[in-house]
Structures are given as C-alpha cells and as structure tokens.
Amino acid sequence: MHAHWQRHYRDTDWLLVSHAGTPVGRLYLSRWAREHRIVDIAFLPEHRGQGLGAALLQDLLDEAARAGKSLFIHVEKMNPAMSLYRRLGFVKESEEGVYDLMRWSA
C-alpha cells in the first residue's frame, strides 16, 4: 500500500503517528502552494475514539492557519469521522461519488 502512495503521490509526506512511543496510525499530507491536503489518515482500530485523531487534526489546522492556507480532505459520506471533521470546522466543498471533499479555512 505504501508503495502505491509513493508512486502516485510523490509530493506527499508520509508520517507514522505515534502515541506514548507506540505506532497508532498514519498520515499522508500534501503541502501545495495554495492548500494543504490530507491524502490519507488512518488509525488502528484500538486507538480510535481516544481523541488522538482530533489532536492530530488540530495540529494540522494550526499549521494550515499559520501558512494562510485551507486544508482539504476527501471523506467517504458514511465515514463515522465525518462528525469530527464538521465539529472542527470543515465544510463540504463538493461531492465526488461516494466522497465529499471537505474544506477548512482559517
């Protein structure tokens, strides 16, 4: 899977998300001239619902705000994390099949 992301998203940073020294998830993030985009974010099932995703997203929002850029993410319409994105201020920019493109602006 990682090889796919490296091949198709060469300008994307890959980050291993850790908590208390334990790997808990991954993040693929593109920082483009006009925007930042979360290409992929995932947490291991046993580490979901503990506020780790919210904390990571808040760090990304803070970074985007400092850079004066919007932050985008494609989210499956039925993804339980959709409520988290909305709570953090993301709004639907467009619909693309089973995905909504969500945008956060400073």
Question: Model regions: which residues?
Answer:
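Conserved GNAT acetyl-CoA-binding A-motif
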Residues: E35, A64-E76
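Structural recognition of alpha->loop->beta junctions
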Residues: L88-G89, W104-A106
